[in-house]
Amino acid sequence: MSVKQSGQVFTPHYLVCNILDVANYSGKCILQKHIIDNSCGNGAFLCEIIHRYCKEFLTESTDKENLKKELQSYIHGIEIDEVAYRDCISNLNQIASTYGMENVDWDVRNDDTLKVRLFDEKMDYVIGNPPYVRVHNLNNQYSEVKKHRFAGSGMTDLYLVFFEI
């Protein structure tokens, strides 16, 4: 699938950090808050989120088993592309291992964000870099996109649906 069809462009680290800073994702206020990247790709945002979460948690506690539970409970992701999803899990595991944690059961799903409703209205932060795809390039996904308010009529981009979600 081409970039034009998938809208898949990975986010550079400096931009990830800037976006998280603008969203005020730092300090004690991030602990025990749900965050999702619903187009997580290879995990650029999730890796930085995990790094920030671990760093903040470890200023208060050395209980890595509890830290692991919190990472599994409060950090979420969705990625439709199976290769990017596997890369994401691998990248998250590398970050976790730098903090002395293994076998984290990440709440990252290889699924279509347009169809997942599990996380609706349950997040404290929604962050990421959604795909930029014109509706006429969506092929068979068009009927699902039309169900969303922003994409109800005329020409639009898929990224608007991700803002609505």
Model-derived segments and spans:
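SAM-dependent methyltransferase catalytic region
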Residues: 1-165
